Design a protein with these regions (language model features):
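Solvent-exposed, amphipathic alpha-helical segments
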Residues: 25-36
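Structured, amphipathic secondary-structure segments that form assembly/contact surfaces
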Residues: 2-20, 34, 38-156
């Protein structure tokens, strides 16, 4: 401190913070891609945000789900999807990650929990307002997406 003014002790480089930035980027992408509400505009908004963080492998997955009517079904059934990150492993040398999480799907009559594991690599790109970490997920794929628990909701 210089009087009441804080002094910048040391600047950090992206290399020093890569592990934290990579995990944050991966978690942010999964939040946007897998948090869904029964609202067309919200789904378009979150998918647009997610697409800034991933290469064409994410777009291909989105288009496949869209063609199958997945997003229309969410709106039609008033389903709400939430994602919970359990952990993310990141190999700095290979720039590879594995995401481990759970997805909660709440429908009118039941709540379904799914286990989700995805993997991919990260590529450095310029930082932008839409991609603040300066990373792009490439070769993204789902390794596991299975039901782990289903509960019937009580009608009051």
């Amino acid at each position: 401190m210089d009087g009441n003014v804080p002094i910048l002790v040391r600047r950090t480089t992206m290399e020093e913070t890569l592990d934290v930035e990579a995990k944050s980027h991966v978690e942010m992408f999964h939040h946007y891609f897998f948090t869904l509400a029964p609202d067309d505009k919200y789904i378009r908004y979150t998918m647009e945000k997610a697409m800034y963080l991933v290469d064409e492998t994410g777009l291909a997955q989105y288009n496949t789900l869209k063609e199958k009517g997945f997003y229309s079904n969410i709106v039609g059934t008033s389903a709400v999807f939430s994602i919970f990150c359990d952990s993310i492993t990141f190999n700095k040398e290979k720039m590879e990650f594995t995401y481990y999480g759970r997805q909660r799907i709440e429908r009118r009559s039941n709540i379904l929990m799914r286990e989700l594991v995805t993997a991919g690599q990260l590529k450095r790109v310029p930082r932008t307002e839409n991609n603040p970490h300066g990373l792009l997920i490439v070769n993204w794929r789902t390794l596991l997406n299975k039901d782990i628990e289903q509960k019937t909701k009580s009608n009051y």
